[in-house]
Each structure stands twice: as structure tokens, then as C-alpha cells.
């Protein structure tokens, strides 16, 4: 899901339009997963799906409008586009694993002794690469399952009752951010 949102068509934009508009008027919008350990329990951790964006104050309305568009209207059922995205992720992942082999090895070895590192490996390391490689190899057989999985993940992850906004900027804009972020909770 983190690798798909922002890279598929939405209700009002094709992927290309979304990409061009977002990058022309903001510093970008990225989805990801953050992992936080619990200080009093080295085996426990918490994960959060994140959507991050940067914009000048004059483009703040647009930034939140585009975040809302991505979160609420992304077309996750376009299997042709999903196949392209999976291929791109596999290619970039392969280059990343090779180019940063030392980091890959550290994460993979840590995954054997730490539940948090194991999760991180599954989300961004060798485990993730193997998952993506399997999806690409068996895409035709799994495409309906992939779409259903993405749609279920959206329903489970993007929820009003577990929504948090983190803002860095001028104090004068806090109220504007509170108002704009309300639309993301739909």
C-alpha cells in the first residue's frame, strides 16, 4: 500500500497528472511505514502508516487537498498499473539491495534476533524484495488477490479513530492545519 498510494489514478487525476501537479506545487507527498520501539520492552514495537508532505504556506490548502485525494479516491483496482508499479519496485529494490549491501546485511542479520528488525526487513529489506519478486513473478495469478489485499489494507489502516497529525511550521498556521487535516479523516 505504501508503494502504491500516490502512484495510481485517483477520482480526479490520472497518475501522471497527480505526479505533475503534486511536484509542481509542493515539495512532494510520500507514503510510508514508521516503526517505533517501546522503551520498556525490547520485543514490542508499534507501526504507523504515514503520509508526509511539504509545501509553502501558500500551497498548504493544495497539499491537504492532494493528500485527501490520494487517501480517499485512489483507484486500487487498476491491475495494469499495479503490475507496472510492482515491476518498478522490484527493479529499484534490486538496485538498492546491491548498492547498499552493507545496510541490507545489517538489517537482515538483526531481523533474526529482533521482532522489530524482522518487521522492518519485511517492509523494506530482503523480505520485502522477496515478497515483491513473488508478486511480479506470479502477478497474473495473484492480481485479484493483490487488489483485494490493497483494498482491505486501506480499510484497516486509514481509519478516523486512529488518525494523528504531526506538523512542523509557524505557530500561526496550526489552526489552518487542524482545519485542513479534518478532511483527511473522511
PLM feature spans:
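M16 family metallopeptidases and their MPP-like homologs
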Residues: 1-73, 79-140, 160-169
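Generic solvent-exposed, charged/amphipathic alpha-helical segments
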Residues: 2, 19, 68, 151, ...
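Structured alpha-helical segments in the cores of large, soluble enzyme domains
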Residues: 142-154
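Residue-level signal for alpha-helix termini/capping positions
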Residues: 155-159
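An aromatic/glycine/proline-enriched structural segment found at the starts
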Residues: 166-186
Amino acid at each position: 500500500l505504501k508503494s502504491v498510494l500516490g502512484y495510481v489514478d485517483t477520482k480526479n487525476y490520472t497518475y501522471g497528472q497527480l505526479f505533475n501537479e503534486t511536484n509542481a506545487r509542493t515539495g512532494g507527498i510520500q507514503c510510508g511505514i514508521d516503526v517505533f520501539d517501546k522503551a520498556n520492552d525490547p520485543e514490542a514495537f508499534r507501526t504507523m502508516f504515514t503520509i508526509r508532505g511539504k509545501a509553502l504556506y501558500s500551497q498548504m490548502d493544495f497539499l491537504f487537498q492532494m493528500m485527501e485525494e490520494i487517501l480517499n479516491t485512489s483507484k486500487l483496482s487498476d491491475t495494469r498499473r499495479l503490475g507496472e508499479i510492482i515491476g518498478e519496485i522490484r527493479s529499484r529494490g534490486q538496485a538498492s539491495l546491491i548498492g547498499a549491501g552493507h545496510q541490507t546485511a545489517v538489517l537482515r542479520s538483526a531481523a533474526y534476533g529482533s521482532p522489530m528488525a524482522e518487521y522492518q526487513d519485511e517492509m523494506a529489506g530482503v523480505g520485502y524484495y522477496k515478497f515483491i519478486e513473488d508478486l511480479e513473478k506470479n502477478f497474473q495469478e495473484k492480481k485479484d488477490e493483490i487488489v483485494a489485499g490493497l483494498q482491505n489494507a486501506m480499510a484497516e489502516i486509514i481509519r478516523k479513530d486512529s488518525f494523528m497529525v504531526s506538523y512542523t511550521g509557524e505557530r500561526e498556521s496550526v489552526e489552518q492545519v487542524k482545519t485542513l487535516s479534518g478532511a483527511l479523516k473522511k
